[in-house]
């Protein structure tokens, strides 16, 4: 009987150790092997297909998942990896997942690179139970074919299982999106202050921008999602907005800003509490990101029922101007929204979508003149 007890204890110890090993404590930055540079053994692969679900260190794969080396050819198309030498491709109904130790109740933003490899309307399902969201990746915003995306969730327990899933059903089962550079950071949603009724008006709180990334991070439409990777703000449009940083772009104020990259299809909004009959002033900066986005631009700002069009002549080398709009609240809740009137393309490659930058957005109540 004593021997059985010892064996049972030993098996329990082994199971606990294995469980602990499969769940990694999270720190802001790249997930363990989030760049997929540690790959499967040759015995765990058939061509590019991964045969063993635990073949990629720190990850578990399900379905038809391929391990792709930069320079791999798909027919006449050359597959290029954005950083490092390797990425994974998710076939029909395939997924990758990783378990992380997190703080229950904390908000997190996931950042990852994705590229479509087929002409079909590709999308990704990102989930950390019970939160999930579908991210369309059909629109290619950069000339490289790779775009960085962000998605946010609130941890419901002290363990988060991050799942990236391809829900597509294509004619070619190997025809699916490439994934690379999976990273995450904690979010600390700011609150309104006596100097700004808006939350996160300077866009300083947002998704992780990977070091060395020069494209910015796309924040897709999150109409159905509970949490935004840009705390305080909603993306109320068909296309994404771009989160840019001072390390790689020109930013009017602080270290972060938003680039409106898809004309009227690229809009951000925030609903704030207001007092009916009270006067408010919305002020903000409009500029360009120093990314060769040249030409005549117009940002349209909406405050309650009032509208302001702000023209900006961009040389594509950085710069900004300030604007403001005064309005009287007609409701206890007022919507603040921005979008770009026109589409624009970078003048250095004529294939990357770009647009005006907005930053330093402030809303204050004022006395009537």
From Swiss-Prot:
This is Protein DUF642 L-GALACTONO-1,4-LACTONE-RESPONSIVE GENE 2. It holds the Pfam family DUF642. GO terms for biological process: root morphogenesis. Residues 1-19 form the signal peptide. The gene is DGR2. Disruption phenotype: Reduced roots and rosettes development. Keywords: Cell wall, Glycoprotein, Secreted, Signal. It comes from Arabidopsis thaliana. The lineage of its organism: Eukaryota, Viridiplantae, Streptophyta, Embryophyta, Tracheophyta. It is found in: Secreted, Cell wall. Glycans are attached at residue 125. InterPro entries: DGR2-like_dom, Galactose-bd-like_sf, Pectin_Meth_Modulator.
């Amino acid at each position: 009987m004593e021997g059985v007890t010892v064996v049972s204890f030993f098996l329990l110890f082994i199971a606990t150790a294995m469980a602990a090993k499969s769940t990694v404590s999270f720190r802001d930055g790249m997930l363990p092997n989030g760049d997929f540079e540690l790959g499967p053994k040759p015995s765990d692969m058939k061509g590019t297909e991964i045969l063993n679900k635990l073949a990629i260190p720190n990850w578990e794969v399900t379905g038809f998942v391929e391990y792709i080396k930069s320079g791999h050819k798909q027919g006449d198309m050359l597959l290029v990896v954005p950083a490092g030498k390797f990425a994974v491709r998710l076939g029909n109904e395939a997924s990758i997942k990783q378990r992380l130790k997190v703080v229950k109740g904390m908000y997190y933003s996931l950042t990852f690179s994705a590229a479509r490899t087929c002409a079909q309307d590709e999308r990704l399902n990102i989930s950390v139970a019970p939160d999930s969201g579908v991210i369309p990746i059909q629109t290619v915003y950069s000339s490289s074919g790779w775009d960085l995306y962000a998605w946010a969730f609130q941890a419901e327990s002290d363990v988060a299982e991050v799942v990236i899933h391809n829900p597509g059903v294509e004619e070619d089962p190997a025809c699916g999106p490439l994934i690379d550079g999976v990273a995450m950071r904690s979010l600390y949603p700011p609150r309104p202050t006596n100097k700004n009724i808006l939350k996160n008006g300077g866009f300083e709180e947002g998704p992780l921008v990977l070091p060395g990334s020069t494209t910015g991070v796309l924040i897709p439409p999150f109409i159905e999602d509970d949490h935004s990777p840009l705390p305080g703000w909603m993306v109320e449009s068909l296309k994404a907005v771009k989160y840019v940083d001072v390390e790689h772009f020109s930013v009017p104020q602080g270290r972060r800003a938003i680039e409106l990259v898809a004309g009227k299809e690229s809009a951000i909004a925030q609903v704030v509490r207001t007092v009916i009959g009270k006067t408010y002033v919305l002020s903000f900066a409009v500029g360009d990101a120093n990314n060769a986005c040249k030409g005549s631009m117009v940002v349209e700002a909406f405050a309650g029922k009032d509208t302001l069009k702000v023209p900006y002549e961009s040389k594509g080398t950085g710069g900004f101007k300030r604007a403001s709009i005064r309005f009287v609240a007609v409701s206890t809740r007022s919507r603040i929204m921005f979008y770009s009137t026109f589409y624009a393309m970078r003048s250095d490659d004529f294939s990357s979508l770009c647009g005006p930058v907005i930053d330093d957005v402030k809303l204050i109540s004022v006395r009537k003149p």
